[in-house]
């Protein structure tokens, strides 16, 4: 796979996430992240710095949820929903290697957002193979400013 193909693939996932934010009423930010907490694709409303922080926060919350569900033998964590003063944070796994994090406004209808996230995961999950995730990771790493 060439660098140009990697960039095109990354742009496709960025477009899909951006489209999600524009299509789903109340969604303000969205991010696909790897299981190890690295951003893979983000909506245009998420800056590069924010994408890294949101990915790390999401990964940390998922880890806490997994440990809590394991401790009480409740099975795998399927989604996380946090109600914030000015909106919501939602996380849903995309297979075992990635996840979708979404921030919304306070006016967002959670039922609609959760449904749209489920549709997004079902429609894109098959495309996020380990190879594609590795390619996206390389593209994101190459985009980072060097100190």
Question: Which stretches of residues belong to each language-model region?
Answer:
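Acidic, low-complexity cytosolic segments
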Residues: 2-27, 36-147
């Amino acid at each position: 796979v060439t660098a140009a193909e990697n960039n095109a693939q990354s742009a496709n996932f960025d477009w899909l996430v951006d489209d999600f934010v524009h299509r789903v009423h109340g969604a303000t930010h969205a991010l696909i992240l790897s299981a190890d907490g690295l951003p893979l694709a983000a909506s245009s409303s998420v800056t590069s710095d924010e994408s890294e922080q949101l990915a790390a926060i999401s990964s940390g919350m998922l880890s806490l949820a997994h440990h809590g569900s394991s401790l009480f033998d409740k099975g795998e964590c399927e989604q996380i929903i946090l109600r914030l003063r000015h909106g919501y944070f939602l996380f849903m796994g995309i297979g075992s290697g990635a996840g979708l994090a979404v921030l919304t406004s306070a006016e967002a209808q959670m039922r609609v957002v959760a449904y749209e996230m489920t549709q997004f995961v079902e429609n894109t999950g098959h495309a996020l193979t380990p190879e594609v995730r590795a390619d996206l990771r390389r593209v994101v790493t190459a985009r980072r400013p060097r100190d």
